[in-house]
């Protein structure tokens, strides 16, 4: 899957306005896909990587409801709660975005590659 990677620096057009008030925010973001629009309502859903079935179901449920009501979901693309939240947002026909602990040129964990692909195809990042 080819998806252009780009960078946006603090103070440049495209850098998220909601991050500007914080002095310790990154000076540069590396992006694959898209960033949420400044006017887009967002909610973060995070949790354990090794979690119960109930935990996964709740992450997916809340993400689906939020997405169905126009709220973009942000999580980390890790196994467990994060992946469940992204899946739920996609089921809710919404956009979902990942904040990664690795480079945007790889998918970690590899088993979430199909999920990452669907996120990008759906206009997320």
What annotation goes with each model-predicted range?
Residues 2-125:
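Glycine-biased, small-residue-rich flexible motifs in mid-sequence functional cores and linkers
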